[in-house]
Amino acid sequence: MGSGDWDEIKRLAADFQKAQLTSTLQKLSERNCVEIVTLLLEKQMLEVVFTNDGKEYITPDHLEREIQDELYVNGGRANLVEVSKTLNVDLSRIEVLAERIAAENPSVHLVLGQLIDEDYISHIAQEINEKLVLRGEISISELASQFDLPSDFLQHDVVEKHLGKIIKGRQDASNPRVFFTQAYIQRCKAKIRGALAAITRPINVAVILQQIGVQEKIFHSLLDEIAPAGQVTSKLANSQYVPLIYAKTQADWVNSFYKQNSFLEYDAIQKLGISDAKSYIRKQFPNEEFLFLKRVALGARLVELTVVTALNECSATKQYLDLTTILPSNLSEEDIEEVFSTIMGQKHSNPNNFVYLDSIVFSQPYLAQLVQPCQALAESQAKAAVDGGVYQQYIVEKTLAQKGSVSTQELEDDGKVDKRDERRKKASSGKAGGGAQGRETKTKSTKKHQRGKAAAHNDSDDEDDVQQSSRGGGAGNKKAMKPLELVKTADIVKLITASLEEEGLEHLAKPISALYTNQFNQTALARAQELFEATPQTNRRQTHAAIQDRINTFLIDIRLYEKGLKLFPLETQTQLVKYLLKSLGNDICNELSLYVAGECNLTVKNTNLNVDQRIKLAQECEVQYRASLLEQNKALNKTIDEFELATETVLKACSMIIKKVDKKKDRLLIADHKKKLQNQLLECQEPALLLHLAVLILFTTITGSILHASGKFVSAILQHIRGSLNDEQNALLLRYHDLVLQVLQATPDSSESKVANEHLQAMQVQVVELAQNFSRASVFKADC
C-alpha cells in the first residue's frame, strides 16, 4: 500500500470522527417559525412590535436602540414622524418609546413630536451666540421662528441654561425674552448720548430712534444711565425730547414777557413749542395767581391793582371807564369783555352797578343822568297817544287778541265735556250724516269770514275741527300782539347824542338807547294807562261804539248764512242752524256779556265764556241787564229769529242800535267771502280741509249764497250741488271724498293710508281747478 493511499485513509477517518462528534442540525420551515412565535405571544412569553406591512417584527428594546440610532444619525434632533416612516413602525409605538427614552435619559428632550439631545442644544447655543455677537441683540421670538422650536423651550432649556457659558451676553431686566451683549449696550449708549448732545430744540423721540437705529425700549431703559442734558416728555409713542437749553430759553422768554406786560398770550407760548399753555404757566409761576381767559392769562396783580381799582373809582365818581386805556394794548375787544365779565362774576363784585358797551364801562348813575331827559319824552308821548286815540285803539285790539289766543284747555269745563259726549253719541247713531250715500266727512272746519273790524272767535262744534281766524286772508293762528311803541330808539338817540359827542362816545348812542327803549316805553304806556283811566267816560263811549259795530257785523253774517242753509232739507237745516248759533251766536253772547260785565265793574279772567259761565255772570250783573242776557243764552238752542229777537233786547238794554239792513251790499259781501275761501284753497295742502273749502266755494258759485258749515256737513253739501255738476265733476268730488274718508279711518303709517294720500295728491290740482274755475254759466249750461 502506497503512501498516497494511507493519506486518503487518514482523511476519511478524520471526516468520520468529525461526523460522530457533531450533533444533528434540525431546520424548521417558515410556517413552523410563525406558529412558534404566535404561541409565545399568546402565552405572553415574548413581546414584539410588528412593522406597518406586518411582514416583520422587532422587539421593543431593539426598536428603542434603532430610535436612538436615528437620533444620532440626524444630528441630535429627530422628528418622530420621519422616524416612523424610516423604521416602518406605527407612529404611536414610536411616540411611546420616545417618551420612555426622554424620561430615562435627562440629556434627551421630547419637544413637539421631536427628540432633541444635549449635543443639538449645545450646537444651536453656539449658533445663537454667533448671531448675538454679530447683531448685539436677539429675542426669543426671532429664535423660535428660526429654529422652529417653542419659545419657552428656547428660553429656559437653551438660552438661559447656556447664558454666560456658551452664549456670551446678558438678559434684559425689563424684558426677559430679549438678550444682548455688553458691547451692544455700549454702542447704543454712545449713539444715544451723541444724538441727544447734538439736539438744540424739541424733537420727537421716534425721529431720534429712526436716525440712530436704536429700539425704543432700549432707549428708555438706557436714558437714566446716560443722564442727558434734557428730558423726555413721556414714554408714549408721541413723546418728545426737550433739551435743557431749549427749556431754559423758553422759560427766560416767558418770564421776561410776563415781567414786562403782566399777562401771557396762549398763542405766543404755543409758538414756543409748548402745547398746554395753561399748565406751563401754572408750573412756571407756582406762586403767582392768574386770571385764565380764553386767549390770555392775566396776572392777578394787574387785575386787582389796575382794573378793579379803576372800576371802584368809576362807581364812586358816577362816571365811565375806557378799559382799553388801563389794559395792555395787545388785548382784543373780546379779551377785554371777558376780563370784565370774569371780574363781575367774582363774589365781591356787583354787576348791576355797571353796563359794558364796546370796551367802555358805564356806571349806572352816569347812564341814569344821561337819559334823564327821556322821562319828559315818555310823558309827552303818552299824552299824545291818549289824546289822539292811538292808545284806545291799542287797548281794543289787545283785548280782541287776548280773546282769540285763549287755549282750548282753559276753555274746557265739566259742562263742555258733557256736550262733547252728547255729540259723540249723536254721531255714532248716524244722525249727523246725509247725502253722498250717507257718508260723513270728519274734516277741519274752514274759517268764518266776517265783515267789519272784529275777527271771529273759535268754533266749538266739533272736537276734531281746527278753528281759525275769520280775518287775515288765510292766515293761521293769531300771533302774539306787539306792544304799542310810544317811545322809539331813535327818539332816545336824538336826546343823548349831544351829551355823548362831548365825550367822544357818540358811536354808543344807539346801543345805550336800545338798553332804555323798553324801560321808557313801559313808562309811557303806564302813564298812558293813567291818563286813559282818568277819562272813563270817553273810554266807555269808544268801547260802546266798537262793540256795537261788531255785533251788527255778526248779525249781517248770520242773515247771509241763513239764506244759504235754507236751501237744504229740514233735518240738515236744523243741524246747520244749531252749528251757526253755537259759533257766531256764541261770539255775540260773549261780546255782550263782557261789555255788560265791564259796565257793572265785574272782573272776568277768561274772555272766552261758555254758557254756564255767561249765566253765572248774568246773575251777578245789574237788574236791567240780567233778564235779557239770560234769555239770549237760552235762545242759542232755539231758532235764528228767536236768537235775533233776544239779541235786540240785550242791545236795547245796552243802549245800542241795530243798523238798517242794506241788501244792495249783499252781493259784494258774498263775493268777498268767496274770494277769501279761494285764497285759502290755494294755500291749503291738507286733503280734508281742501275738500271742505272746495265744496263751500262750489256751493257759493252755484247758489249765490254763502254757507257756514263744519266738516261733517261736506257730504250733505255734495249731495245738494251734484245736480249742478256733470258726471265727470261729480265723480271727481265723490272719489276725492271717499279717499279722504279712507285716510281718516286708516292708521297714519299704514300702507292703505299711504296709497290713499298718493291718490289724493294726484287729484288735488283737479279739485282746486274745479272750485276756482267753476262759474254760474256752467250751471246754466248744465241745466239746459
From Swiss-Prot:
Keywords: Transferase, Ubl conjugation pathway. The keyword Glycosyltransferase does not apply. Its EC number is 2.3.2.-. Residues 444-454 have a biased composition (Basic residues). One of its GO terms (cellular component) is endoplasmic reticulum membrane. Pfam families: E3_UFM1_ligase, UFL1, UFL1_C. GO terms for biological process: protein K69-linked ufmylation; regulation of proteasomal ubiquitin-dependent protein catabolic process; response to endoplasmic reticulum stress. Residues 405-480 are annotated as: Disordered. InterPro entries: Ufl1, Ufl1-like_C, Ufl1_dom, Ufl1_N. E3 UFM1-protein ligase that mediates ufmylation of target proteins. Belongs to the UFL1 family. This is E3 UFM1-protein ligase 1 homolog.
